[in-house]
Every structure is written in C-alpha cells, then in structure tokens.
Amino acid sequence: MQFLSPQMEQKLHRATIHQITVSKTGDMPIRFRLRHLNYRNNKKQKNGKDKETTPPPTTTGAKEPLVNGHSAAVNGMNGHTSEGEQQKDKTAAEDKKKPDSDVMEIIQDTGFTVQILSPGVEPLSIQVSSMELVQEIHQLLMDREDTCHRTCFSLQLDGVTLDNFAELKNIEGLKEGSIIKVVEEPYTMREARIHVRHVRDLLKSMDPADAYNGVDCSSLTFLHTITQGDILEKKKGRSESVDCTPPEHIMPGAKDRPLLPLQPGVGKKGPQPLKVLTTSAWNPPPGPRKLHGDLMYLYVVTMEDKRFHISACPRGFFINQSSDDVFDPRPDNPSYLCHSLIDLLSQISPTFRRCFAQMQKKRTQRHPFERVATPYQVYTWSAPALEHTIDAIRAEDTFSSKLGYEEHIPGQTRDWNEELQTTRELPRETLPERLLRERAIFKVHSDFVTAATRGAMAVIDGNVMAINPGEDAKMQMFIWNNIFFSLGFDVRDHYKELGGDAAAFVAPRNDLHGVRVYSAVDVEGLYTLGTVVIDYRGYRVTAQSIIPGILEREQEQSVVYGSIDFGKTVLSHEKYLELLNNAGKHLKILPHSVLNEKEEEIELCSSVECKGIIGNDGRHYILDLLRTFPPDVNFLKLDEELSKDCKALGFPIEHKHKLSCLRQELLEAFVESRYLMFIKHAAFQLQQLNSAKLKQKQEAKDSKDSEKKEEPKAIEAAPVAKEPAKKDAAESNNNVESKEECPKKGSTDKAKDKSAGVPKVETEEAKKLMESLLSSDEKNESKEVVKRACEAVGSLKEYEFDIRFNPDVYSPGIKHVDNQSAANSLKKQKQLVKDAAEFLVKHQIPSFVHDCLDHTAAPMDGTTLTETLHSRGINVRYLGKVANLLAKIKQLEYLHTIAVSELIIRAAKHIFTSYMQNTEMMSMAAAISHFLNCFLTATTAVSHSGSLSESDALTKSGSSGGKQQRRQNKRSAGSKGGKPSFQCTQDNNEWQLLTPKSLWSQIEKELKSYWDYELLPAGAHDSADPVVSHYRLQKISLLRAFCLKTGVQILLREYNFEMKNKPTFGESDIVNVFPVVKHINPRASDAYNFYTTGQSKIQQGYFKDGYDLISEALNLLNNVYGAMHPENAQCLRMLARLSYIMGDPQEALAIQQRAVLMSERVNGIDHPYTIAEYAPLALYCFANSQISTALKLLYRARYLATIVCGENHPDIALLDSNISLILHAVGEYELSLRFLEHALALNIKYYGEKSLKVAVSYHLVARTQSCMGDFRSALNNEKETYAIYKQQLGETHEKTQESSECLRHLTQQAVVLQKKMNDIYSNGKLTSGLPPIHIQPPSMGSVLDMLNAINGIIFVQISSKEIANLKNEIEKRQKEGGTSEQAAAAQASQEEVDRMLTETMAKTAAGIPFEDHDKHELPVAAEASSSKQADNSSNASAQQVS
C-alpha cells in the first residue's frame, strides 16, 4: 500500500468501508434499502425511517438527563451496561465541546430528486440523499421490478461515468432534477458470473428454502400469511360476514398441541419459470473460444422441456449450437443475443416470460422487511420436507475453498483482524464519526460471525485441513479464511488442574464474556480478538481472528504480559498496566501483585491467565480472558469456610471445573449496595457526632435541633435500592477522596455519584450532612468516621470507598504479595469475593423472586428466564436454587415449571454433547431420533432399523475390515480433518445402547451434581412421563427447547408422544443439525442515549417529545445496524404505542406491523418477544375496525404461547381477556365466555381473589352472561366485582358505585325474566303487560375502551371546568392549612398545583381513590404540562397503568 497516492489510499479505504456496509448479493445497502423500499411501499409512514425526520427539539439538551444515569433504560435495550455508561460520559463531554450543527449534520442530510433513464423503461424519479453513494442507486435499480434484471451497467451524468464509491454531494453538476443515464457495459468473466448469480437469486427469491436451510441470513415470517396480505391495504369493515370461530386447538383446555399451524401456508408452490439453470459442463471456454470472447457457458431446461446451451460474451448472452455430447459453441440461428439473461430466457420460453412477470409482481408486493437479510443467521427448529433442486451456484458455494465472491474485497481473502481493529480505530469525536465507526464495527462483526460459523461447520464436517495433521483429532487446530479454529478439549493438559475437558469446554464461553466487557469499555489502544464460540454436532469450536505475526514465533516469545503456565512465569509490561488499569476501573478489577517462581514481585491489572501480545502491527492485544471476573466461591471447594447462610443452602457445590465466575451485573449491584451502606453509615455517625457537639453549644441549640430531627429520618429511611440502576460505577472507585486533603474534590465526586442507584432525597441529605461536617475544622474526628464506615463496608482503602475485586484471589498455584496489616490485605480481598457470592444468594435471588410476583414481565420460556436472571447477575448454575424457591410460592407455579424444564433441557444437552461425539456421521440421523425417543417417550422400541439397513448396505458392498483399515490409514495420514467421531470404530453403535431409563437416570445425576437439584418424583424415572406429569410439563415445549438448545431441526409434522408400539421419531424426522452461535453484540451508543432520554420524557408525560427522541433513536439504529435488528424492533414497538396513545391508531398499526415482521425475522417466529408483539398489533387492528384480523392475530399469539409454555401463564390470561372482548363485540357470547372464564381462573391464581384485575374479570363475565340472558349467573359474578371494589376502593368510589348500578340493573332484569318464566309455567302462555328484557349489545367504542384498559392504556377525559374546580379546591385547602406566608407560597407555586393535578389524573386512570396521605405513591405521567391542559376545553391524557 505504501506506493499508492494518498487520494487512492483514501478511495480504497472508502471502498473497504463501503464493502462493509453493503450486504449480501442482490440486497440493497442497508441505509438505502430502508428508505427507498419503504418510501415506495408505504408512503403514509412518517416515522423513524426517513432520515429527513425532524430532529429532537434540542439534541444537546436532550442528552442532559443521561448524565444522571439510565433510570429509564432498565429494560429499554437488551445490551450490557458498561459500554453504554462509558460512551454516555464521553458523549456528554464531547457534546459540550461541539456546536449543534455537527450533531444535526448526519440526521438532516439534504434530500433531492433525480431522474433515471434506463433502456426500454419509462423514466424513473427517485428521492436521494446527499450522503449516499452512487453504489446505492445501483443497488436500488437492481431491486426494482422493471430494472432488476440488469447488473452490468454504469450511471452517467452528462456523458461522464460516475464513480461507484463517490458520495452524491461530491459529484459536480448533480442537483435537483438532474438526469442520470443507465448505460449497459460490456461483461467480464466476473460480471457475467455476478449476473448469473443475480438471476438465480431473483428466480428463487420467493422460495423459503434458504430460510429453512439457514443460509444467506434468510429467515421465516408468517405475519402476512396469517393476516392474508398487508394489513394497511385492507378495507375497514365490520366482521359479521367473517367466520370468527377459533380453531379447536386454541380453545381453553384443549389438550392437543399441533405443530403444523406453527408454519401456516407451507407447501403452496409458487410459479416455476424454469426447470434447470446451471453452469454447463463445457466450462471453461478453451483457448480458441476465449479469443472469440466466450466467458462462460450455461445450460437451461425450460418448462416446455427444451434444452439450450447458452454462451456469455462481453455483449451479453446468446444460444450456441452445443448439445449434451457435442461441443459447438458457434451462435445458433437465431441466437437471440441479449444483454440480459432474463431477456434471452423470455424470448426462448413463453412460460418463463409469464411466470417471471408473476414472480416479480409478488416479489415487489412483499414487505421490504420480508426480504432484507438479517445481521445474524436465525435458524428454525422445524421445517417441512423440501424438494432438492439442481443448483450449480449452490454447489459451487459449498465446495469452493473460498467463500462466495461477495465476501471478498477485490483481490484478497479478508484480513479479519485488520478489519476488526481498523474499524475500532476510526475517529469518534462527533456524532457523524461515531455513527460511521459503529456502523463499520457492526458490519465487520456480523460478517465475521457469518464467516466463523461457516468455517466451524467446515472444520467439524472434515472439510478443512488441520495445521497439525499428525496429532490426535481432539488436539488439531485449523486456519481457514484468516480465522483460527480450536476445539473445546483439554489439549496438552493445559486445564488439568482446573477440571480437564470440562474446564476446556467452559473456558471459551468465559473468554467470550471477557472479550465482551473489554470491547464494551472500549479503551483506546487496547485490542481484543474477534471471537465467536460455535457449538455444532456435539463439539465446541472457538473461532478467533489472528494476531499479525503470532504464527511466526513460539507463544513464549510472543507474550509480554501475563503468564502462559498459570502463574509460574509471570511477566508485566508498563503499557499493558496503564491500558488494563484504565479498563479495570470500569470492570471493578483490583491491580495486585504476585510472585513468580524466582520470588520476584510482579504487578498485574488483570487475572494471571490474561496474556498481552504485541502484534507485528504494533497493537497491544489481550487474550485468554477466561478469568476476567472473580471466582464464584459458592461453587469451589476451598480450605476456608463459607458463611452460615450459604452453608445452610447447600453451598459450596463442587463443579466438574473450577472456572465458575461471578457476572459483571452482580459486581455492579454489589458495589452499589455497598456504596449506599457506606454513605448511610458515615452520615449517621457524623450526625451523631454533630449532635454531641450541639449539646455543648446551648445558644444555637433550638435552631439546630429542628434540622436534626429531619436529617436522621432522611438517613434512616434510605432503604437498600430494590433494583439498583444499572450504572457503571467507575466513579465509585474514587467516590470519597481522602477528605482531609481535598474536601472540594470529595464533594464533586459525591455529586457525580448521585446517579449510582441511591434513593435520591435521602442520600443527598446524607451527603450534604457529611460534606458540611467534613468542611469543618475538626477533620480528625470526621476522618475517623470515614475510616469506620470504610471498615464497615470492607473498603480496600482506609480513608476512601474502594470496592474492587482480585480475580486471582483463589487461583491455585499463584503466590500473592500480601500486606496483612493493610486495608487491602489478601484476607480482605478474599472476604469481598465471598461477600459478593453471598450477596447473590441472600439478596439477588430473593429479590428476583419477589419482583416476579407482580407478573409484569413474566418469562415465557427458558431463554427469557435466563436473560432475566443474567440481568440481575444470577448465573444459570443457581437455577436449581431458584427453582426450589419458586416451588414454595403458589402464584409462581408457572415460573417453577419453566425453571424445571430449563434445568432438564440443559442436563439433557450436556449428555447429548458427549453422545454426539461418539456417533459416526453415517448414523447421525438415527442416533438423534433415538435420543429424542429416549428423552420424550416411554417406548423402548429403537428407531434405528432403517439406519442400519442403509449403513449395512454400504458396509456389505466392500469388506468391513477393508473399511476399517481405510479409516486407520486416513487417521495416520492426518486427513480426518478433526473428526473425533472417527477415532474408534467400535464406538460407532454405542448410541443404540441408550434407553429411556438410562438417559433419565443420567439426567437425574447431572441435575444433582451440576445444580444440586433433586428431580421428583424420587426414584420413578424410567421415562419422561412421571416427570412431565409431576411438574406439569409439556412434551412439545420440551422438544422445542431441546431443538433450539442443540441446533437440531426436525420435520414439521404431528408427533404422537403416546405411541406404544412404534417410536415417535424416525430418522427421516431429523432434517438437519445447525450450529448454536455465541458472540458479542456491538452497541449503537448514541441511539441508546436518545432512546433512554425518550423513555424518561415519556415517564414524565411528554409523549410528543418522547416520540421525537425515540424516532431519532430509530434513525440512528438504522444507521448503525441497518434495517433489521432486535433493538430496532423494540424502538418500533415503543413508537407504535406512543402513536396510539397520542390518538393515531392508523400510524400505530403501520409501525407495529413492522415491529412484528422484524421480530419474526430477527428473534424467530415463535420467540416470546414475537408473541408479545402480536397483542398490541391486534389491539391497533381492532381500533382500525379490522376485527377479523385482530382475532386472527390473537389466535396466533395464543397458539404460539401454548406451544412455548402451555396455558398456565399470566400472559395467557391477558390474551384470553382480549380474545373474549372481541368475540363479545361480534356477538359470539358463548365462545367469549369460555375464554373469559379461563382468564378469570388464571387471574385469581396469579393475582389473588381480591385483586382489581380479578374484579374486572368478574365484571366482564357478568356482562357476557347478561347478554346471553343468564341473569342469575351474571348477578353472582357482578356481586363478586362489587365486593372487591367495596373492599379495595371503598363504597363511595366511582367504580364501586358503577358496579352497584350494574347489580341493580341485573336484579331488575332477573326479576322480569323470572316473572315471564313463571307466567309461562302457570298459564302455558304469556300475558301481556310485562316490560321487555333489555339485552344491550355492546358498542365498538365501549369494547375498545375495555381493551385499552386491560392492556394498560386508559384515556382520562378532564374538562377545563373540572381543572378549574380542582385548582380552586387545592388553593382553598392550602390557605386553610397554613400561615399567611404559606398561602402566599401556595399562590406562587404553580408547579405544586400542576403536580397535584397530574396525580389526580393518574389516580383516576388507575381507578384508585385520591387521598391526601397517599399522593406520593403513584408515578405521574401526563401528556403535556398542566398549564397547557388548563387552556384546552377538554384534554385526553393517556396513562400507562401496570
């Protein structure tokens, strides 16, 4: 590169970065795809997608709340905290430095319209942005229906060809209304291949095979199948004409859980334009034909059964005279020379012309989100039987040693390490720079994950040559496409002391956690390797980018920091100490010293195993981060005792390995709780010290005593934060400086710490008290107080709060430098690690269980349960203890079931891993189906009869001895490519020996040894059945969870688990095995900041401001992640809800439809997040009068939920209430009642018989029964409602009175009915004169109000008259209550009036009586400030009621 001009280098760099931003072949670049496809498909949509959205009112202002922490963001985005906070501090500082115009530049780039002239097509006007590249117009044209068949063309403006990588703003003469011409260019070999591949992609664009096979980042979506097309294009209509009857399997109490409805509409075949399109066996052209311009040959069989051989030349494609057995490349007569292959095929095949037009129409009608590639591959656990077609390009992709050409920067294999590190080095001063940097980081990372996954599969499948082929299969290592692959086995007894293979299996996952946190901290100058951990076919493969130069020298020569032999030889390095110390402040890692074998003192700022290597590129890399965090002593056998509480709970549990570490989330929560304790302790002591002095100063006693009464309250009232705000408490390390030296600095540090999750008022009072005393003369006394507080919380500094952890504190074989009298003695360091582990058991787990009792975000399956535990720092190895706690709480029975099924699945996965390693490739399908039979059914019949016949047939064809001999030879030649399954042939049929009884006894043992969990009923584990019935598990849910955990894909059909005579699963039911991939998730930090600010605005009631900020967050997310990402889906859901609350249900529907589509694509069609997206979409459909669509969506959500977790779940209660209300609206009272009664039963179970939710359910049941004429039952149910309201809200409350009125009406109707019935019985006929029975069918408006209410949205109407009355009442009360001084203050304090007003509204919305003493209990949310409300005659404010 040194010989390139600076301009050329810059252009190449731009090309590289662009390569990063362009996705797979034929897809549009992310940013462009998003805007133009949506602009075209959905002009009505006005949020978040177009970069021309209005920016937030003041961006710099908007960022200010972020400096106070993430209070609003606890469940906003699902990333990790440390990066967010560190970026946040940085961003805040940088935003002060830079002018607003910089921030706006990226958000409001200028848009203008240009005209595109293509040959043979009408002129086309498109909207472009000045920031786009010419390449993006290229991609747009390749995606449009009328121009998609062109790939080899240039764009010209006034006769000048435009540079593909130039930004539009840099092109001279390009302005509003400019005409750009499309000029066909001559083909080269590469362009011809690109064209053929593009044509093939167009022909299979409607085929779901790629999504089922898990390739090219395709994934499934069924939303439009369920709603029968785009919801937005439907006509509004009442649903009387539509059949609203739910399928039988969706009805409450249905026992069947069919699998086929999971993928509706599967098996419908689209139009088929060609039988075969493939490269010809006559390739490549011989020398003489090259000189005539032949580039390649194709072979085509049309639907009319005609066979053609086609030549590609620089001018296009033509028919030649070759046949299957005669090579004659001369042009045929006629030869139909066409520049586009599509045009040629249209001329030779009328069927092709017709079908291709139909396909194009269908393709462009699909929502853009249905066809955009996802950033990471999503695999589906069930698939229909797919037809396998001839596809030369697929074959070429599979067997070529390179990846498809789209993965290459021209002329070289990608240097992953260079790309990953260069993107991190991009500037990040301004918002536009940060966006470009994060976008590049994300794109390179997702490409790396794709390549690493492909490589790992190739390694296990035996398609890659090992770099040490002579060694045993388990010890082999591989390099493929500049990525290094190693297997999860204990090579060279490296982990012998730590647990051998068990430790080697866990180490890559721990290492990945380390890479994640160091990447998130993002210290400039410190580099981590690109790391991906792949589990495939029972093997764990670690894929890493390669440090430049590391392969040229021995590891001993490379390492300049850390130890390669677990602490015997330890090295340190000044630069590494500086870099790691900076990172360690954020990660709570304590710098510490150890002794090497020469007894020399070596300082470290990380664990001993962490190695520092300076690459040939001069960068400082760290690797082997498996002990980034301190060990979890609850799972280690130590010489020291644990606390009594931990021992009582059965700890320590000894694991197979010694690499159990605490999570970063736990350490942050622990440090925060200790800091709170420190502040309270010190403030309380200082307050007591002060009160002693005050007694000596009699003259000031009266005035000071009044202050003292308030302050102790403030200090004593500070409770431990129930859910510490997720703050990177890097500041905490130096929170309280040594006070005697620098009081001012100490005070600023404390001010900074207001956000550390401490209850504000009380803690601030405590701090003020401390500061006022610390600035006094008696420094020695206050110094003593701080010292005592430090001792009380176990601080590692005598006069400062300093809680950090030494990760090596319990590492075997490491000698520590210990100063026993110091504050940071080894004993204290060890105690802190023990305390943190105890904090997990005594505080985090009970608080998790307690918080689950309100069922607000109830986990639906093992994955969501695991995420929830991790967010609190609870490792999955504590799941057994969590399950035991849950078992004791009746309301959490559903969560106990989920926890137990997750335990069983994980235990089964552990056994399955080694089971797969002992199975040879030819028996794989038979072995997996046999395992599933043993795991889920009671039958002992083995399902492998078919498999044996197949392999027997192959074995008999040649002598088995010869076969064995060949294998042995292969092995000694080292060409078995890391397939340990070929190690010993006699093991090949070991899998057949497994029985249901032996498998379940292994599962029982695994549960006991790993989780200390006793599986009930004890001793009755011959098969799954006793366990399933005891814990109320569902076999279909277990099957789904097992397949997702292990990567097994099964055939989509109905499985009968109760069959006694033949096995449930046969080998034909195992369709595929996919990799399970773990990797880090790079974050969009600025978008995160906008999102959290928007959330806090919404919580304050400023919905419009919140909407603008979250729209902007979506904009930035689209910039960084592209169109598809789980965080984009969260943003869309929030925007839809805001649109609905602000009175635009149509807009809400448009946005929520995109949220559902995106969630299906990036999370999976049956992921709990996707299920959660369906319910709001149904609500917005109902609000837009699309009643039958709303029901279909709710039926879909309920069906998916029953597959995932069964009917016993709080979310099912909500879904059933929604379904019943809509069925009630269309007059299907009997069906409605079945769903309502089920919802009522669940609500009583989860919320208690006297909760307001249950009262609402009783009322809905009564309402439905009265519509059916069953007044007696209705009366009984309404009495329940009345009793609950009376008890909870009091007799005078509006709700109680409404219920009372309802009772009166029902009683009246019941009396009328009874009289009529008596009349009939006595006389045999009706006498006239009785009033008619009034059965009032509900209005759509009343049903919608009720739907809003049960979904947590209530609109409160407050007229200006009511506002005026309320203000007068408040002022009157204040005047009565106080002195003239207070009255004056009351008049002046408009804010107080506003606050009380919003509280009144919130109380009204929640249906709670407004009383003086409980005003502070409810979080306030009003749509606008109350001064605005007073001006409006009637104002609707939407409250979100949990």
UniProtKB/Swiss-Prot annotation:
Residues 949-958, 1424-1442 have a biased composition (Polar residues). GO terms for biological process: intracellular distribution of mitochondria; mitochondrion organization. Residues 38-100, 237-258, 696-763, 949-984, 1373-1442 are annotated as: Disordered. This is Clustered mitochondria protein homolog. It holds the Pfam family CLU. Belongs to the CLU family. CDD domains: CLU-central. The keyword Repeat applies. It comes from the Eukaryota. GO terms for molecular function: mRNA binding. mRNA-binding protein involved in proper cytoplasmic distribution of mitochondria. It is found in: Cytoplasm. It comes from Aedes aegypti (Yellowfever mosquito).
